[in-house]
A protein has these predicted regions:
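Hydrophobic alpha-helical segments
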Residues: 1-185
Length: 185
C-alpha cells in the first residue's frame, strides 16, 4: 500500500493547481502511477510531466531504446511500478522475452547487441556513475550527440520516477508484471 494517498482527481488539489492536473491528464490520459504521488507537490508534478512528455513522446530517440533504458532503470532501482509499466510496453514494441528476462535477472545472456548496448550503458551509469570513453564514442556514433543526451536524460527521468515510487511504496498496477526486488541470475 502506498505511503501517501494517491491523488487521482483534480478535486484533491487546490483550485490554483487544478490546471496542472488537467495538463497531466491531457498528456497521459489519466492520473496514475508516480504522478498520483508527485501531485502532493503540484508544481513539481507539472514540471516533471513536461519533461516526461519530451522523454516519452516527443524526443527523436527510438521508443524501443527509451523503453530498454526505462526497464533497466526499474530493475537497477527495484522500482516495482516502473518495471510493470515498462515491460508491458517493451512487449508491445517487440523486445524479445530473452532480453526482458536478462534485464530482470541482471545478466546479458541472449540479449541482441544493440539492446545490450543500451542495457549495459544504463547499468553502468547507475552503478558506477561514470562511463568509459569508448562507450560514449559508440553511443554517439549510433545516436549522435543529441540522441546520446536524450538517452542519458531518459535514464535520469526514469531514475526520478523509480526513486519516488520506491519512497512512496507504490505497487505495480493491477495486471502488470511484478518485479521481485533484488532478484539476480
Amino acid at each position: 500500500m502506498a505511503r501517501l494517498t494517491a491523488i487521482t482527481s483534480k478535486q484533491q488539489v487546490a483550485p490554483k493547481d487544478q490546471p496542472i492536473v488537467d495538463a497531466i491528464v491531457a498528456s497521459r490520459g489519466a492520473l496514475q502511477g508516480p504522478f498520483t504521488m508527485f501531485l502532493h507537490c503540484p508544481e513539481l508534478a507539472g514540471r516533471l510531466a513536461h519533461l516526461g512528455a519530451f522523454v516519452r513522446f516527443e524526443g527523436t530517440l527510438d521508443m524501443r531504446v527509451r523503453v530498454l533504458a526505462a526497464m533497466t532503470v526499474a530493475r537497477e532501482l527495484d522500482a516495482v511500478y516502473v518495471w510493470g509499466a515498462q515491460t508491458g510496453q517493451a512487449r508491445k514494441l517487440g523486445v524479445p522475452e530473452t532480453t526482458i528476462a536478462a534485464v530482470r535477472e541482471n545478466h546479458s545472456r541472449g540479449v541482441p547487441a544493440e539492446d545490450a548496448q543500451i542495457v549495459e550503458f544504463t547499468r553502468t551509469l547507475l552503478r558506477r556513475h561514470r562511463i568509459e570513453d569508448g562507450t560514449v564514442k559508440a553511443l554517439r556514433a549510433r545516436f549522435g550527440d543529441d540522441g546520446f543526451i536524450q538517452l542519458t536524460g531518459a535514464i535520469g527521468y526514469y531514475s526520478m520516477l523509480a526513486m519516488t515510487v520506491n519512497a512512496c511504496e507504490l505497487e505495480a498496477a493491477p495486471g502488470a508484471e511484478v518485479l521481485t526486488p533484488g532478484a539476480t541470475a
